[in-house]
Amino acid sequence: MVNVPKTRKTYCKGKQCKKHTQHKVTQYKAGKASLYSQGKRRYDRKQSGYGGQTKPVFHKKAKTTKKVVLRLECVACKTKLQLSLKRCKHFELGGDKKQKGAALQF
C-alpha cells in the first residue's frame, strides 16, 4: 500500500517562484474523451451502417495495475506539474501514518 501526504514541499519552476515551495497533491484522473476528436469522428463514421464491428477489439490485457500519477499544484503561483509513481495495487492520499505493530487494513 502506498500512502502519500496531501501536501509536499518541492521545487516549483513557475515564472514567479523558481524555488522550493509547498504543493497541494491530488491524484491525476483522465478527462472525458471528446466526441469531436478526429479519431472518434472517423471511428463513428466507419461504425455506422451495416457490417458490425470494423476495428479490432483489444482482449489480451497484460497489466493488472496502472501507474499512479500525482498532480502537484504550487500554493503560491498555482503552477501545476505531474509526477508519476511506480505501479501499486493500493494507493491512498493523505491517510493515517502507520504505527509500529499495527495490522494492515484495506
Curated annotation (Swiss-Prot):
Molecular function per GO: structural constituent of ribosome
PANTHER family noted in UniProt: 60S RIBOSOMAL PROTEIN L36A/L44
GO cellular component terms attached to this protein's record: ribonucleoprotein complex; ribosome
BP-aspect Gene Ontology terms: translation
InterPro entries documented for this protein: Ribosomal_eL44, Ribosomal_LSU_eL42, Ribosomal_zn-bd
PROSITE patterns noted in UniProt: RIBOSOMAL_L44E
Residues covered by region (Disordered): 37-56
Alphabetized Pfam families for the sequence: Ribosomal_L44
Signal sequence, start to end: none
Protein name (database record): Large ribosomal subunit protein eL42
Alphabetical list of Gene3D superfamilies matching this protein: 3.10.450.80
Keywords annotated in UniProt: Ribonucleoprotein, Ribosomal protein
Entry superkingdom: Eukaryota
Homology family: Belongs to the eukaryotic ribosomal protein eL42 family.
Keyword Cell membrane on entry: no
